[in-house]
């Protein structure tokens, strides 16, 4: 069981009752021995696990009762500066912006947030009283005090139009910079060696600087490129501005740096050296100014590669920006089986299911709006019956679906007629019975970068090949065995795991839950023939006893981008 207080997971001091089933009492205010003293406003009880819906339920309640909930900076703390038109931190009690009439008549007004943590547009509208309003100060929510201000009325960006109302972009408030004179400047420079900078904006012109200090320190979109310049060293990426976009520039403080657009990496050029990036002006500098809305800028003076999926998902979800899936960011997979959507361009389903008793036809189950398995559609199709997987669709685009045409009880389960959707760590899973469940592909390929999310019990193969010389198996609750020409056995203290197998010119390696597990000096060259999921080989009685959620396989070495792939997987499945 999990307990949350105002959206934050509570630390449980005991696990007593964690496995208890139904509760017999239905009285409010007492359990028969202890009585509640205080006021109660709302109690809602579900007879089902609502983990997937918890955030939306909490947001609804928190918004109505004006209870601040955790924000992006609670989940990913440590920002050097953070400017936004939504509340980013639960403990933040300040305002979002300070505004004044564009004609400089009257005083300033601080505009905060409504109960849902959004900009208080009602207060902004009241302050405007039909006049255009501009931003005098954009408050820093990081706690560092780097408020960005503009003392000259004519150089202030607009937040409210006297004719059309609140400036919005994709339905959310935005600060509109005119591309001419508008800037907001903080008095202290922010110097960044290692850094991650997340910016949500819309560029309406090809050559625009959105954050900078001088012509040697800035972030900008130029014709055909998005650019970071630190001192005299540039890091560019081929890019054409197109509508509302989440940009992220990340570097580790030594060399290089990577540009991401809506979470998808851009091809970078320019060998940026270890130069400090100094910033102090939102909207640009000199004659290089940004034209268009800016909604959020968050700066970290550290490399946030491990937290990037979490930050980008948070931003994308709030602003309605479609964030790139795993295969959009890291393309080229030979096969990809998952119960989440791995690519924004994928239009197929996740699985095809049928009743376990083979009554009725099959039903294709796709994804919900958040990219997870459409468990509502699965529950409807089940109609109280146990459901099994007949096909696990390949999302790589190669058409290598894993199927089981036999109806003789050899299909893995995805829905239990009594307990509902099969789950592992709160996410849907395909359950293999350890006896005879297997999905077949009929495909032969090399394994040079293999990522899987599985929980196995006892001895059983997560996947294998027709001949049985190549497989990945669980030996017991803590030890695993990978074989592909050379055997690699390794031990781990956890059974839910992310696996990497990658071969290069001289060695092969395995990593579990983001950490290297073992390296073999033997290059593993054999290919998997007739790749199968849940079984060691065509003649073996060794089957997977446990749950499988994702298998993504590349035929090329993925060591360089392993950390990014594992961060993506771990963010979704919360493995380690």
Located regions from the model:
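Predominantly extracellular/luminal cell-surface or secreted proteins
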Residues: 4-6, 46-48, 100, 229, ...
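GGW-centered surface loops in extracellular recognition modules
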Residues: 39-46, 54-159, 168-176, 181, ...
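Surface-exposed, flexible loop/turn segments at secondary-structure boundaries
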Residues: 51, 265, 305, 539, ...
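A generic alpha-helix structural signal
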Residues: 14, 19-22, 58, 268, ...
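Extracellular glycan-interaction patches encoded by glycine-rich segments
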Residues: 20-49, 235, 275-304, 488, ...
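Parallel beta-helix/beta-solenoid repeats that form elongated, surface-exposed shafts/blades used
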Residues: 34, 109-113, 117-125, 216-219, ...
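Surface-exposed or flexible loop/turn and strand-edge residues in extracellular/cell-surface modules
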Residues: 23-25, 35, 40, 94, ...
